[in-house]
Amino acid sequence: MNYITSLLLLSSNTFLHPTTTYLQSMNDSIVLVTSSVSTELTTLGYDPISTISGVNGTNNIDYIKLLNDTNSTFVQLDNSDTDIDDSSSNSEDVSSNDEQIALMNSSSDFSDESDEGNDSDDNGDEVENMENNQANESDTQNENDRVLNYDTSSSENENENENENENQLEQEHQHYYYKNRSKFYNHFLRYPEVVINNNDDRAELASTKNNLLVRSPKSNNRRLIGSSRKKTLKSKSKSKSSKLKHKSRKSHKRRPKLLKSKDVETNEITTVEVITLTITKVLARHDLAAIVTPIQQHQSGHLIIGYPLPIATKSRLHGYYKSSGVLKEVDANPTEEYDSGDGKENTQQNPIPEKMRLPTNDDPYSLKPTHHYDPSATMQNPHKQFTNRTGNFEIPTNVQDIDDITFPIDLSSSDSTSNLYSILPMNQTNLPDVNTLSLAPGTGSVPPRYSNHHSEFTVERPPRPSRTKKRPRIKAKKTMKVSTQISSAMSKSIHITRIGSTSSGIASGITNIVIPNSSSSIYDNYQDSSSDKQPVSLSMPTKTITMTTDTTSEPVTITEKLDKPKFPDIFTIIRSKLLSKKPQETKLHSPTSTDTKSSKLMSSSSSNNNKPEISKTTKEYNQTQESTSYNTTKAVPKTSVVSSTTSTKPNDQGNNILNSFIQFTETIHSRIRFPTADDNNNNAGNNYHRRFTGVVLPENRQFVFRSASQNLSFSVLGLIILLLLLPGLLIIIM
């Protein structure tokens, strides 16, 4: 649809509404679909959006309903190879005029059966053009036979006299004619006063010879042309005898070269239609009144798609053109001139006749009760046929080419349909100027939706509707770094040294790291506690982990900030805690003395933070702690580690190192409160637990160490354990 809409953006100074769009090009025809809905169009029973099969030639569109819409206009343009400048300068030759009038004529054989076979147009040939022989047989008629007759009650001599006067006017001005594709038609373009009531008098109209229907039973095609007239027996015999004589001369003289093909019939006429179709049905179902004028025609043959035509439903859209051809400010209320009950309505270009209301005969531009037309009345005032309905008798001056069209279209909407479409409706009362267009009815402070620049045509996209079901979004994994800060009391006794240093020993400040039971971990307590509603963010206050030393009861606190967790740093710090720079002797102490000094994992369990109190005395890790006194002269000391077993084998010592690291990591992990979906915080639901790459916590609580880069295999981890066990192995050997 965007591609089709872009075809209508003809020039830089074109003002087009996006609802008007090219629909299709078929049989050398360009079909325009224009939104043109009256305020009472929903009562006509428009079906939902159906396939546009009637445009393709299958004639499935209910044209009767479309033609009941008084704004629907069917326009047929002659495709003769005449120059437009010739027609505007009144210097057109007779041959092109003969073919022009010949398109509107036919033999009386067709007109005799024009009121029969109304249901015989289902063969899909309505889209086709007139047959070539129809145009050829009427090309050889005399000038008295090349005119249009509108008086059915006059005699044949009166018809010939009237036809002579009209033929002289036809040589001065070339005009395009309407051609309807159904029995019921709407408006004439050149003869704006000849409008027949198409609402209730259909059976009466079908019986008259003034009907503009012509059917062709010979070719099994229904030919709907502008007019059908009575012909004399002389004209019938003359047209039949000269059919084959002038066939090749007239049929190929004025046809464009690009349209020459074997199928002469379908390439004879180019049709331009402005119809109400798909967009009309969409707008009608939502009670949106979109009112659009039919096409006006300039003297030179250019098309002016003008301002909305005042219709019988008392439309408030009755603006008029400025002399420059742009919109001019109009009143919000309809004037008395455009009232549906007033007879002045028929002074406009394409009036909509009331049911039985006919104007007085003193108006030269009014519709006569006998549908008689005086051609000299319109041709003496050629300007009025384009502009008399708009209230201004000046022809727009900006129409210089077919690409330069002033096309203001208004959508006057109800209050409930402003957000239903991608094309928001505009209100006519908010159009004091083209550059200050409003978005919605009644709002004057809304910025203009259309660009007021002449170099572009932009339409703002309306906000997309909110999704009812949110799609899952893949979030990038971000590694959380744990930065552990050691207090000053801790840093006094911890010295970081390299692995394998000859002077490495045990730090006097650390002999035991208290870890709670894994069976009843803090993480499970968080999951099971239903009373703990308030989440603890990652930027929670710092926690203190109190650990006791083996020599003194002075607690050593480690202050941790969980803003930036970094598990490789934890591994480095734990390793540095297990190693010491200065060799110091560690005295053996009994398990009973250690039990009195057994450490507790302290947490600031205040009611404000809703942190669960954790005051678990450790199971007697100190009973299993292995402390060895060694000689200070030994170059390679033995490292004492926290273990959970009583075994003193070197392999068990390596397992103790790994277990102590895993338990310490579990402690940190269990202290972290993950945000839930119920959090009011903006960071809730960001799945912070998925960003941990250091420790994987399966459901069976079997902790598996995994590095962030996942390159650290268990073989590398075993190599690290062997490096840590080398001092112990050397001591055992010695």
From Swiss-Prot:
Residues 78-145, 216-262, 331-360, 447-479, 582-653 are annotated as: Disordered. Transmembrane segments: none annotated. It is a lipid-anchor; GPI-anchor. Residues 1-16 form the signal peptide. Residues 228-259, 464-479 have a biased composition (Basic residues). Residues 110-129 have a biased composition (Acidic residues). Residues 708-734 form a propeptide. This is Predicted GPI-anchored protein 49. Residues 87-98, 592-611, 632-650 have a biased composition (Low complexity). The lineage of its organism: Eukaryota, Fungi, Dikarya, Ascomycota, Saccharomycotina. One of its GO terms (cellular component) is plasma membrane. Residues 130-141, 620-631 have a biased composition (Polar residues). Keywords: Cell membrane, Glycoprotein, GPI-anchor, Lipoprotein, Membrane, Signal.
